[in-house]
């Protein structure tokens, strides 16, 4: 059975194409700075938003019309696998990602849940034999079920801690079996609503203990995927322990985990934390902690996680600038943790949305590489910080001075001349590059 009978293979047709089922800018075979676009971008499909999302909201029921929704239970899970691999093949993406409950329903017991997972994992593994699509990462959903009301690894209930560990243990086994290149930890409920009833130190210490156990078990079974933490400041909890990259990095350092983890950075989560996407990418990059990306965008007018498909070319350009400066994402990728809008409820909309996102990052890639080749931003930054390349500034950078010498230098100064930041000029130049890239 075909779940998308009206859709053929999605291919690159160029900017002048009016075919909605074609890439306008993403040409997977096009060479950009020695690598193909496909090698640079490493796109991934989010199983949950694409194949399980009902498009409901707090004010209304789901609107999604999906041919596989005629089934229920394990039959539905199997139909979703069939639909997923048809979708992967037609849009030609190299990777996909999932939570455990995305691919198989929870049973009435943990043992039954394991059995359901075993059936679907075997089916996915069989499909992967004839597919070019691989598993970028998998993870455990330790936030949806009511048992996680007080958290998972940070729960006030030791039984919930144990249950969460069992799910991650199974997830690591699945990751190894399916060849996952990474394993993600998103602490959806690892946080608190009120300090009045929270043992903050115990919860954070337990979270650290949990991560160490995960590292140990991965080594025990020979799972060599990269561990990734996905920061988010709030929602569903009021304050989450992995607020942003800086907070997460401090946590990892405090618990001696910084050599075992990197970060999976989501654009919309950066927005919720009061940061730009590129800020979070830059902070991770300069600390050698940039592992993977959840490619989406948020609505700056709203205060929650809208998970829109990325179409902001300014954002994709600055994101790709950071990724290119990082030397790529290594084993990571660009996972579309994004859902179509509630009014875009037909199955074809899934293709339109992913095409838009892939084209947007293709544009961002080419513009970012041109900015790097021409040293546009580097020239402005080098000029702005010129004072640290000579004189007292160079002595500061080299660690060859102290407060006594700096005071003596300051006393010898007249009026200090400062330099313009030229930020408006820089933004105008970026606009030029965006407009000229495909002119």
Curated annotation (Swiss-Prot):
One GO CC term, this protein: cytoplasm
EC number(s) stated in the UniProt entry for this protein: 5.3.1.5
Name by which UniProt lists this protein: Xylose isomerase
Any one Gene Ontology molecular-function term assigned to this protein's record: xylose isomerase activity
GO biological process, one term: D-xylose metabolic process
Ligand binding (Mg(2+) 2): 266, 269, 305, 307
Catalysed reaction equations from the record: alpha-D-xylose = alpha-D-xylulofuranose
Annotated keywords: Carbohydrate metabolism, Cytoplasm, Isomerase, Magnesium, Metal-binding, Xylose metabolism
HAMAP family, sorted: Xylose_isom_A (MF_00455)
Cofactor note: Binds 2 magnesium ions per subunit.
Similarity-based family: Belongs to the xylose isomerase family.
Entries under PANTHER family matching the protein: PTHR48408, XYLOSE ISOMERASE
Main subcellular location: cytoplasm
Localization per Swiss-Prot or TrEMBL: Cytoplasm
Name of the gene: xylA
Keyword Magnesium found: yes
Binding-site list for Mg(2+) 1: 230, 266, 294, 337
Names of the cofactor(s): Mg(2+)
Keyword Cytoplasm found: yes
């Amino acid at each position: 059975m075909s779940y998308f009978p009206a859709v053929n293979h999605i291919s690159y047709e160029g900017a002048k194409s009016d075919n909605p089922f074609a890439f306008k800018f993403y040409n997977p075979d096009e060479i950009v700075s020695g690598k193909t676009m496909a090698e640079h971008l490493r796109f991934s499909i989010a199983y949950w938003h694409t194949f399980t999302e009902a498009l409901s909201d707090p004010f209304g029921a789901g609107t999604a019309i999906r041919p596989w929704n005629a089934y229920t239970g394990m039959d539905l899970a199997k139909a979703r696998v069939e639909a997923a691999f048809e979708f992967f093949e037609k849009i030609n993406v190299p990777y996909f990602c999932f939570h455990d409950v995305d691919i198989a329903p929870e049973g009435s017991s943990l043992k039954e849940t394991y059995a359901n997972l075993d059936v679907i994992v075997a089916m996915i593994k069989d499909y992967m034999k004839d597919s070019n699509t691989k598993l970028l990462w998998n993870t455990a959903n330790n936030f949806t079920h009511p048992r996680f009301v007080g958290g998972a690894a940070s729960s006030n209930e030791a039984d919930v801690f144990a249950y969460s560990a069992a799910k991650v243990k199974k997830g690591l086994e699945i990751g190894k079996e399916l060849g996952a290149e990474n394993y993600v930890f998103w602490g959806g409920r690892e946080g608190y609503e009120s300090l009045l009833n929270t043992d903050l130190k115990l919860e954070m210490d337990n979270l650290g203990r949990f991560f160490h156990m995960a590292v140990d078990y991965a080594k025990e079974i020979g799972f060599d995927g990269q561990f990734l933490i996905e920061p988010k400041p709030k929602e569903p909890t009021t304050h989450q322990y992995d607020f942003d990259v800086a907070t997460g990095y401090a946590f990892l350092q405090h618990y001696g985990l910084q050599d075992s983890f990197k970060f999976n950075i989501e654009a919309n989560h950066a927005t919720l934390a009061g940061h730009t996407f590129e800020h979070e990418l830059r902070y991770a990059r300069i600390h050698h902690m940039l592992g993977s990306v959840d490619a989406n965008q948020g609505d700056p007018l709203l205060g929650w996680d809208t998970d829109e498909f990325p179409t902001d070319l300014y954002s994709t350009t600055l994101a790709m600038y950071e990724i290119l400066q990082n030397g790529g994402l290594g084993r990571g990728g660009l996972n579309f943790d994004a859902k179509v809008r509630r009014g875009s409820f037909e199955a074809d909309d899934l293709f339109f949305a992913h095409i838009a996102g892939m084209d947007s990052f293709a544009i961002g890639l080419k513009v970012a590489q041109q900015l790097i080749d021409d040293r546009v931003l580097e020239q402005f930054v080098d000029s702005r910080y010129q004072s640290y390349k000579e004189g007292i500034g160079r002595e500061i950078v080299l660690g060859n001075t102290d407060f006594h010498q700096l005071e003596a230098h300051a006393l010898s100064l007249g009026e200090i001349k400062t330099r313009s930041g030229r930020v408006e000029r820089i933004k105008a130049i970026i606009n030029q590059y965006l407009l000229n890239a495909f002119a």
